Amino acid sequence: MTLTDKLSHAFTNGTLIDDEFCKEMLRVGNFFVSVSIEGFEEANDGRRGNGHFQKALAAMDLMRSYRIPFGVSICYTSRNYKVVTSDEFLDLLISKGCVFAWYFHYMPVGQNADTSLLLTPEQRTYMKDRVREIRGVTGGKELYCIDFQNDGEFAGGCVAGGRIYCHINAAGDVEPCVFIHYSSANIREKSFQECLQQPLFKLYRKGQPFNENHLRPCPMLENPELLPKMVAESGAHSTDLEAPESAEHLCEKCRAYAACWQPTAESLWQKDHPERV
């Protein structure tokens, strides 16, 4: 197995997408991108730096001119969740040629993560319902939306660790997930097949699904007791490119959230799936 016979998907701020890059995407034929954007100009640039919003839109315009399909990556938080699901914002993306959108629940990754950006149960429930409304056949938008956290039931829970998906960072470290920065394999040193067989990935696949309630899919965010055990057992090290962080430190920031979300998640799951209760 090699990366040349698989679809590869990159998350990017879009600032390096130019004519040459677009031509290269057309040449290889199996590589596509999602441009990160988190709201309109003021809110987006407040998180991603001045000028990013316009550069992101320019990258979309360029890819559209080359007829390259692309998506967006949207991190939703307690502050922007309604804006990034508003008709006005979605219509802007559609007008730029965007065909799909990844919605990612804010994860408190990093030494200085702001846990106030984590959603309340009511806010997360709104996101669950709104994303399904957006992609509805009736009354929806011409934009296919996927909620990485709330759509677990359609994929059998967590998809990471090489079960369906994994992440490769800029240094070549092959990680279970874009939010889980731990690994013991690098694509520059091993084959892709070898990277998929690293101990941490095997533990991921052995443990999946991490919860029978697929509204609680993650071994970090909703089941924070699990990730530190897997990292310790596998011998994986932190691959955070900014500031290494232990799995214990990361998951400690998720414990209050997990406990708060659990009752709502159980209620929603029982309502939607009475046959599984």
Question: Each predicted region: which residue ranges?
Answer:
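Radical SAM/AdoMet-radical enzyme domain recognition
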Residues: 1-104
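Structural alpha-beta junctions
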Residues: 6, 68, 98, 135-142, ...
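Flexible, active-site-proximal loop/turn residues at the rims of small-molecule/cofactor binding pockets
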Residues: 16, 39, 107, 181, ...
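Conserved, mostly hydrophobic/aromatic
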Residues: 35, 172, 192
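Short, conserved loop/turn and helix-capping segments at secondary-structure boundaries
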Residues: 50-53, 121, 125, 185-190
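Generic alpha-helical structural signal
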Residues: 57, 87, 125-132, 193
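A C-terminal junction/extension of Radical SAM enzymes
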Residues: 106-176, 217-226
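Flexible mid-to-C-terminal extensions adjoining Fe-S/redox cofactors in radical SAM and related proteins
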Residues: 179-277
